[in-house]
């Protein structure tokens, strides 16, 4: 993991500088996850948690599957699939109204990805940068796991 961090970190910071330079000073730690989802699994349209300054996904296996789908809004307007290609990466810096996305299996193969995020614990500062209500965000982040658990949706 240390080698992976050493390899990826500098590039990820450069991407964050390009996409959201005001967030660079908020960086505190990196988060890596190797994720395998089933061939029939679908995660609902959502925006990432506010503590993610930069979100990245690297498609590992199989050769072909369904890539990440980006939308204009939570309702799924104007879907744009980032084509799955082994070792392709997608990075973005979440914003409150512009980073709606989801992912799903292709009904043939499980999906294996490496997720790499630049993180902060200073969510209040992120809210200030984005001009959003901190208390609303805290409430949403508290309730979303329950909404997803029972309704397979996010708020």
Show the residue positions of the predicted features.
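Non-heme Fe(II)/2-oxoglutarate
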Residues: 1-25
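Catalytic core of Fe(II)/2-oxoglutarate
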Residues: 41, 50-53, 63-155
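Conserved short histidine dyad/triad with adjacent acidic residue
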Residues: 33-49
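Conserved aromatic-histidine-acidic binding/catalytic patches
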Residues: 4-7, 48, 79
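Substrate-binding/active-site groove segments that recognize
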Residues: 56
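Active-site rim elements
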Residues: 1-7, 42-43, 102-104
